[in-house]
Amino acid sequence: MVFYKYSGSGNDFLIVQSFKKKDFSNLAKQVCHRHEGFGADGLVVVLPSKDYDYEWDFYNSDGSKAGMCGNASRCVGLFAYQHAIASKNHVFLAGKREISICIEEPNIIESNLGNYKILDVIPALRCEKFFSSGSVLEHIPTFYLIDTGVPHLVGFVENKEGLNSLNTLELRALRHEFNANINIAFIENKETIFLQTYERGVEDFTLACGTGMAAVFIAARIFYNTPKKAALIPKSNESLELSLKNDGIFYKGAVRYIGMSVLGMRVFENGCF
């Protein structure tokens, strides 16, 4: 079985094609493992679709399924075009969400992540029990729970240096309390936002998270009156352009093809596929 590795703003993914829906959880855990596998943030299984150019099943590196992943959507869009599965402008199904892809340059991909939902506005009092004394999170007055395909908790710090002082244990506690990815951001100016994401399924900081950037972008737009277009800069320091239009959140940036490989017999013998 051939798989292809792509990277989008620091997130890397293994992409494979399958003509039948199966449970790929064990396969995802093995091939995504950084030391015992090939290493990736997630596995994308591209499947045929009657109503769309294709559909996907997305697996986090721990084998759990997710309905949506922003960076993976851009990576799979380029993969589908390069492998003649779809044209430059196409639509695929991610869980129950339609994702439109536009390839503007050889490696600049824009995806429409669709609409969002504000799930909750959470005062700091509901979160402070998770914070240690002197934590940078103590100074965040309000957190926002936003669904951009998957749920994200968003909070804004007062200065950029605060992003370098985040406590993994505190973010992990918030992740389990709200069953959401955790995003801490700093608005440098109205059009530039820095952020760090603690991602569930990865259970650590990731270099970037597309749906997380979308959630931060929306929270900044609604609650801090930032414009409808902004540059978001995640841990990878790669700038991504996000914009809000009538039909959804648009997310644009570079995608890199890294290489391809073949799954060896050991994977099949262990019953992963």
UniProtKB/Swiss-Prot annotation:
Catalytic reaction equation(s): (2S,6S)-2,6-diaminopimelate = meso-2,6-diaminopimelate
Active site (record annotation): C69, C209
EC number of this enzyme: 5.1.1.7
Compartment(s) where it occurs, according to its Swiss-Prot or TrEMBL record: Cytoplasm
Top EC class, one word: isomerase
GO cellular component: cytosol
Main localization of the protein described in the UniProt heading: cytoplasm
GO MF annotation list: diaminopimelate epimerase activity
Pfam family name, one: DAP_epimerase
InterPro entries reported in the protein's UniProt record: DAP_epimerase_AS, DAP_epimerase_DapF
Pathway: Amino-acid biosynthesis; L-lysine biosynthesis via DAP pathway; DL-2,6-diaminopimelate from LL-2,6-diaminopimelate: step 1/1
Site residues by UniProt (Could be important to modulate the pK values of the two catalytic cysteine residues): H152, E199
Domain of life: Bacteria
One annotated GO biological process: lysine biosynthetic process via diaminopimelate
Keyword Isomerase: yes
Residues bound to substrate: N11, N60, G70, N71, N181, E199, R200, G210, T211
Disulfide pairings: none
Keyword field: Amino-acid biosynthesis, Cytoplasm, Isomerase, Lysine biosynthesis
UniProt record similarity statement: Belongs to the diaminopimelate epimerase family.
Oligomer status and interactors: Homodimer.
Function: Catalyzes the stereoinversion of LL-2,6-diaminopimelate (L,L-DAP) to meso-diaminopimelate (meso-DAP), a precursor of L-lysine and an essential component of the bacterial peptidoglycan.
Name the record gives this protein: Diaminopimelate epimerase
Organism from which the protein derives: Helicobacter pylori (strain ATCC 700392 / 26695) (Campylobacter pylori)
Lineage summary: Bacteria, Pseudomonadati, Campylobacterota, Epsilonproteobacteria, Campylobacterales
Gene: dapF
